[in-house]
Structure formats: structure tokens, C-alpha cells
Amino acid sequence: MKHPLETLLSAAGILLLALLSCLLLPAPSLGLTLAQKLVETFHMMDLNQLYTVLFCLWFLALGAIEYLVLRWVWRRWFSLER
């Protein structure tokens, strides 16, 4: 039997961890030469577009990792199935 609030707590935990990761974890910063090389490689307009894509991918990856960690913790210590 699943816990009745498991889906609600999972979503709330993901949102809380996403907020904490946005506030506390540093996003990657590239050097100017590497950033300009990536802009040319991916045919982007300017550095703003590159950093927008970079931040989206960064926080998407962090969110996926945090989701997996939260799910593992929930099933390991708080699950009712034992």
C-alpha cells in the first residue's frame, strides 16, 4: 500500500529542493573565450542566449538528481511498505 500523501510530498519536496538549488548552488560560469567559442559553435546570437540555455540545462540536471535523491530517501526511510 502506498502512502496517501506520497505524490503530494514528492512534488513539494522537488519544488523546495529546486528553490534551494537556485538560491544556494552556483551555476556554472564559463570563461569569456570558451563562452564565445560555444556561441560560434552552436550558432547563437550572443552570450545571453548561451547562458539561458546553459542555466536551463544546469537546473534541469540538478532537478533530476534531486528528484532521484528525494525518491530514494522517501522509499528508504519513510515508506510504509516493509
Curated annotation (Swiss-Prot):
It comes from the Bacteria. Keywords: Cell membrane, Membrane, Transmembrane, Transmembrane helix. It is a multi-pass membrane protein. The keyword Ribosomal protein does not apply. The keyword Membrane applies. Pfam families: DUF1158 (PF06643). Its main location: membrane. The chain crosses the membrane at residues 8-28, 50-70. It is found in: Cell membrane. GO terms for cellular component: plasma membrane. This is Uncharacterized protein in ramA 3'region. The lineage of its organism: Bacteria, Pseudomonadati, Pseudomonadota, Gammaproteobacteria, Enterobacterales.
